[in-house]
From Swiss-Prot:
It comes from Salmonella typhi. The gene is pxpA. Belongs to the LamB/PxpA family. The keyword Hydrolase applies. InterPro entries: Glyco_hydro/deAcase_b/a-brl, LamB/YcsF/PxpA-like. GO terms for molecular function: 5-oxoprolinase (ATP-hydrolyzing) activity; ATP binding. This is 5-oxoprolinase subunit A. Its EC number is 3.5.2.9. The keyword Repeat does not apply. GO terms for biological process: carbohydrate metabolic process.
C-alpha cells in the first residue's frame, strides 16, 4: 500500500529542512499568506535535494492572519490570484531545473473551496490553464476535488493527521472545540484509520467514510518533526510505503 505524506512549508518554521527528509511532497507558500521570493527559492532547492515532490500553496491575500481570514472575492479575482502564485513558484522551480507536480490551496481558501463550487471552479481552472498535468490536492470528498475532476485534472484527496472532523467529512473550524488534535496517540490512530480503513471518527462520535490519498502534517505544528518520525515508523511497520 502506498500513501503520499505532505507538509506545508516556507511559512517561517525552523523545521522545514528536517521535515523535507521525512515527507514525500512539499506545499510551498507563495507569498500571499507567508513566505517570499527567497524562502520559495530556499524551499525549492531543499526539496529538489531531497527528492521531494514540489507543489504551490496559494492563499487568499492575508499575511496579517496567515491566510485564515474568510473572504468573499469574485471568482475571477481568485482565478487571477491563484494563477499569479502558481506562476511565481513555477518560475523558480523551472530555473532550478525541477518540475512542479501539484497545487494545494492554503487555509481559508482551501476550506471555502471545499464547500463553494464557484470558488473551487476558479482554482481548478487556474491550475488547468497554467498546466493541465498538475495534480490538484483538496479535502477528501470536497467541491475542490469535484471541480478538479470536471477539468480533467488528476486529483489527490487529502486527510489531516492533526485536525478534527465533522460528521459530513469536513474539518472542524479552527475556532471551535476539537478542531486541533494535540495528542500524538490520537493523531496517529486517526491517521492509520483513515489510510488503512478509509474511515474517520468525527468529534460527535460518528464514523465517516473518507478517501485518503495524501496525509498532511502541518509544518507549523509544535510537534511536527517528532510526529512525522512516529508516523513514518508506524507506516513502515504496517508495510505502508510513503511515496509521492
Amino acid at each position: 500500500m502506498n500513501i503520499d505524506l505532505n507538509a506545508d512549508l516556507g511559512e517561517g518554521c525552523a523545521s522545514d529542512s528536517e521535515l523535507l527528509t521525512l515527507v514525500s511532497s512539499a506545499n510551498i507558500a507563495c507569498g500571499f499568506h507567508a513566505g517570499d521570493a527567497q524562502t520559495m527559492l530556499t524551499c525549492v532547492r531543499e526539496a529538489l535535494k531531497n527528492g521531494v515532490a514540489i507543489g504551490a500553496h496559494p492563499s487568499f491575500p492575508d499575511r496579517d492572519n496567515f491566510g485564515r481570514t474568510a473572504m468573499v472575492l469574485p471568482p475571477e479575482t481568485v482565478y487571477a490570484q491563484t494563477l499569479y502564485q502558481i506562476g511565481a513558484l513555477g518560475a523558480i522551480v523551472q530555473a532550478q531545473g525541477g518540475v512542479m507536480r501539484h497545487v494545494k490551496p492554503h487555509g481559508m481558501l482551501y476550506n471555502q473551496a471545499a464547500k463553494d463550487p464557484h470558488l473551487a471552479q476558479a482554482i481548478a481552472k487556474a491550475v488547468h490553464d497554467y498546466d493541465p498535468s498538475l495534480i490538484l490536492v483538496g479535502l477528501a470528498g470536497s467541491e475542490l476535488i469535484r471541480a478538479g475532476e470536471r477539468h480533467r485534472l488528476v486529483t489527490r484527496q487529502e486527510v489531516f493527521a492533526d485536525r478534527g472532523y465533522q460528521a459530513d467529512g469536513s474539518l472542524v473550524p479552527r475556532m471551535q472545540p476539537g478542531a486541533l488534535i494535540h495528542d500524538e496517540e490520537q493523531a496517529l490512530a486517526q491517521t492509520l484509520d483513515m489510510v488503512q480503513a478509509g474511515r474517520v471518527k468525527s468529534v460527535t462520535g460518528v464514523w465517516t467514510t473518507v478517501t485518503a490519498q495524501t496525509v498532511c502534517i502541518h509544518g507549523d505544528g509544535e510537534y511536527a518533526l517528532a510526529f512525522a518520525r512516529r508516523l513514518r515508523a508506524a507506516f513502515n511497520a504496517r508495510n505502508v510505503h510513503v511515496i509521492a
